[in-house]
Amino acid sequence: GGGGGPAGGAEDLAELDQLLRQRPSGAMPSEIKGLEFSEGLAQGKKQRLSKKLRRKLQMWLWSQTFCPVLYAWNDLGSRFWARYVKVGSCFSKRSCSVPEGMVCKPSKSVHLTVLRWRCQRRGGQRCGWIPIQYPIISECKCSC
């Protein structure tokens, strides 16, 4: 599919590079592990794919439908402590389904407590740190 303008080019390449370095990790989803890939083979024949080919097809399918969380540092600015937080995002530049149509979307998040410097002018200026709950994407899933 077509490219965005030159503005996001370097960011897109960095994101894609990070995605390509990531391989599906953990346990293979049971929906993929259970696939026999026997559809379309001649009926009535005891034809089965070799274990090696079946595994390759499963790994390919898993790599196409895998939705990793991509992490990047985000600067919240001088009014926050911690100023820099590592935030997650879901790679959504390509479809994660076969056939195409679904994309990776956030499915779980955790909350990080950061402090924000706030000043109130009522009755003289009073300043102090207030705790803020900052959401961080922790899991992405392939969905509509």
UniProtKB/Swiss-Prot annotation:
UniProt xrefs under InterPro entries: Cystine-knot_cytokine, Noggin
Family label: Belongs to the noggin family.
Signal peptide: 1-4
Organism domain of life: Eukaryota
Gene behind the chain: Nog
Principal location: secreted
A Pfam match: Noggin
Tissue: Prominently expressed in the CNS. High levels found in mitral and tufted cells in the olfactory bulb, piriform cortex of the brain and Purkinje cells in the cerebellum. Low level expression seen in the lung, skeletal muscle and skin.
GO cellular component: axon; extracellular space; presynapse; protein-containing complex
Keywords: Chondrogenesis, Developmental protein, Differentiation, Disulfide bond, Secreted, Signal
Keyword Zinc: no
MF GO annotations: cytokine binding; protein homodimerization activity; protein-containing complex binding
Function: Essential for cartilage morphogenesis and joint formation. Inhibitor of bone morphogenetic proteins (BMP) signaling which is required for growth and patterning of the neural tube and somite. Inhibits chondrocyte differentiation through its interaction with GDF5 and, probably, GDF6.
Organism, as annotated: Rattus norvegicus
Assembly information from the UniProt record: Homodimer. Interacts with GDF5; inhibits chondrocyte differentiation.
A biological process from GO: face morphogenesis
Disulfide bonds: 67-104, 90-140, 96-142, 119-127
Subcellular location: Secreted
Protein name: Noggin
